[in-house]
């Protein structure tokens, strides 16, 4: 289980290129909200074209580079969020004679939530007196998750009922909040674990709350 967890963690890190190219991490073609109205954005030859929502009237053209000063623009989008979460670190409160501790097993979970993304298009002047387009992005997501994880089961965490040590499989569930800033995504989870074997009633962390660090891989 521990080996499987680390393989999953490496997969998540190696998928950063996929994350950067998904619609939620870039200003892609589609309908967005502004302060005044909904608009449709389309990319043509590196230029962002802003149309009315029905695509009939062009409102603005935002080139990648220009010699003329440009106004800044802000767009936002609300979406359904489906992610695979890795929870590499959990903080467990003290139980019985065991003090509060951090555990580092890798946990995989399926996350479903509601997401809001914000994009700011600004033009920065460079030394050649050209204005280069820059897109800053940040987003928020809140939802619930379920998944499987593993935990060390031994005499210390079973009130002396289990005289041997093994890696127990647990079912995890809870809520999570995720923050995205440009290509960086991180979050916090609040959850509970259930040991999926006959020793669940003796495990001191069974159904006890924990707080974890979250890394996510966007699926949709």
What do these predicted ranges mean?
Residues 24, 175, 182-220:
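Predominantly the C-terminal beta-signal and adjacent terminal strand-loop region
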Residues 2-92:
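N-terminal leader/presequence regions that precede the main folded/catalytic core
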Residues 94-99, 124-125, 154-161, 199-203:
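Outer-membrane beta-barrel translocator domains and adjoining extracellular loop/strand segments
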Residues 139-171:
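Outer membrane beta-barrel transmembrane domains
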Residues 78, 102-108, 138, 167-173, ...:
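Residues that define the transmembrane beta-barrel architecture of outer-membrane proteins
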Residues 80-84, 108, 138-144, 184-188, ...:
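Transmembrane beta-strands of outer-membrane beta-barrel proteins
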Residues 86-92, 114-118, 146-152, 181-183, ...:
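Transmembrane beta-strands of outer-membrane beta-barrel pores
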Residues 70-79, 118-140:
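Short loop/turn motifs that connect adjacent beta-strands in outer-membrane beta-barrel proteins
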């Amino acid at each position: 289980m521990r080996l499987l967890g680390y393989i999953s963690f490496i997969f998540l890190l190696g998928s950063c290129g996929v994350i950067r190219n998904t619609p939620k991490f870039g200003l892609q073609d589609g309908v967005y909200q502004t302060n005044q109205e909904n608009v449709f954005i389309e990319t043509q030859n590196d230029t962002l074209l802003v149309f009315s929502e029905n695509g009939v009237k062009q409102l603005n053209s935002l080139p990648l580079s220009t010699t003329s000063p440009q106004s800044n623009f802000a767009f936002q989008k609300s979406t359904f969020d489906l992610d695979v979460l890795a929870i590499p670190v959990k903080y467990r409160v003290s139980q019985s004679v065991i003090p509060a501790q951090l555990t580092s097993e890798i946990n995989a979970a399926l996350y479903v939530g509601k997401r809001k993304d914000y994009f700011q298009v600004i033009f920065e002047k460079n030394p050649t007196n050209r204005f280069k387009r820059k897109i800053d992005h940040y987003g928020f997501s809140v939802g619930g998750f379920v998944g499987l994880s593993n935990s060390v089961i031994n005499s210390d965490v079973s009130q002396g009922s289990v005289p041997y040590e093994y890696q127990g499989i647990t079912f995890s569930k809870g809520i999570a909040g995720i923050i995205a800033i440009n290509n960086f995504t991180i979050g916090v989870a609040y959850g509970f674990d259930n040991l999926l074997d006959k020793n669940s009633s003796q495990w001191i962390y069974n159904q006890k709350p924990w707080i974890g660090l979250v890394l996510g891989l966007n699926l949709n």
